UniProtKB/Swiss-Prot annotation:
<dbReference type="GO" id="GO:0015031">
    <property type="term" value="P:protein transport"/>
</dbReference>
<protein>
    <recommendedName>
        <fullName>Ras-related protein RABA4d</fullName>
    </recommendedName>
</protein>
<keyword id="KW-0547">Nucleotide-binding</keyword>
<comment type="subunit">
    <text>Interacts with PI4KB1.</text>
</comment>
<feature type="lipid moiety-binding region" description="S-geranylgeranyl cysteine">
    <location>
        <position position="219"/>
    </location>
</feature>
<feature type="lipid moiety-binding region" description="S-geranylgeranyl cysteine">
    <location>
        <position position="218"/>
    </location>
</feature>
<dbReference type="GO" id="GO:0005525">
    <property type="term" value="F:GTP binding"/>
</dbReference>
<keyword id="KW-0636">Prenylation</keyword>
<dbReference type="GO" id="GO:0019900">
    <property type="term" value="F:kinase binding"/>
</dbReference>
<keyword id="KW-0449">Lipoprotein</keyword>
<feature type="binding site">
    <location>
        <begin position="22"/>
        <end position="29"/>
    </location>
    <ligand>
        <name>GTP</name>
    </ligand>
</feature>
<dbReference type="GO" id="GO:0005829">
    <property type="term" value="C:cytosol"/>
</dbReference>
<dbReference type="GO" id="GO:0080092">
    <property type="term" value="P:regulation of pollen tube growth"/>
</dbReference>
<keyword id="KW-0472">Membrane</keyword>
<comment type="function">
    <text>Intracellular vesicle trafficking and protein transport. Plays an important role in the regulation of pollen tube tip growth.</text>
</comment>
<keyword id="KW-0813">Transport</keyword>
<dbReference type="GO" id="GO:0090404">
    <property type="term" value="C:pollen tube tip"/>
</dbReference>
Amino acid sequence: MSNLYGDYNQKIDYVFKVVLIGDSAVGKTQLLARFARNEFSVDSKATIGVEFQTKTLVIDNKTVKAQIWDTAGQERYRAVTSAYYRGAVGAMLVYDMTKRQSFDHMAKWLEELRGHADKNIVIMLIGNKCDLGSLRAVPTEDAQEFAQRENLFFMETSALEATNVETAFLTILTEIYRIISKKSLTADDDDADGNSSLLKGTRIIIPSEQESGKRGGCCGKS
């Protein structure tokens, strides 16, 4: 794989803003901590407002800084919506696979995302907490069907066990890079409406069922 972690002294070729969205307590902050710092805190408190972390990596010999934004899922923090989505070239829709309601809310979150972000933003559906297989409330097939219908990537993860977390982030970042490098555009190119135009006209391919794991475990790209 050509994805390697970059040197902080390297020139940054691209900055990709990726947002994490979904209900509270689905593990967005834990996913971010696992990817950015390889940490997991059992006592993680609910995010208040907005925070972001960065990680530098190398894709196809280019240095990419991933700027991952995390926000609280509670309704009272929704005032940050416009600024939160502005400039995002990727998004992760996160639900808790042990809580059906968090998955049922994905359509609402996706609608909000598409209402504020570029219409061709790269989106991945994430079913988190797949380490709790005995408590599964969302069959993998339901999530795959939703992802297929909405043209999203899909992966099941465990921030606790670090299952598929790095793979999920690298998949979405590599797809963003592939699109941008193909179009020879920079990450801050805006159209007349102030939306990133990097991803327009791009078809997103989700992982095939052959690449997915069994229903009882964590599903994702191999």
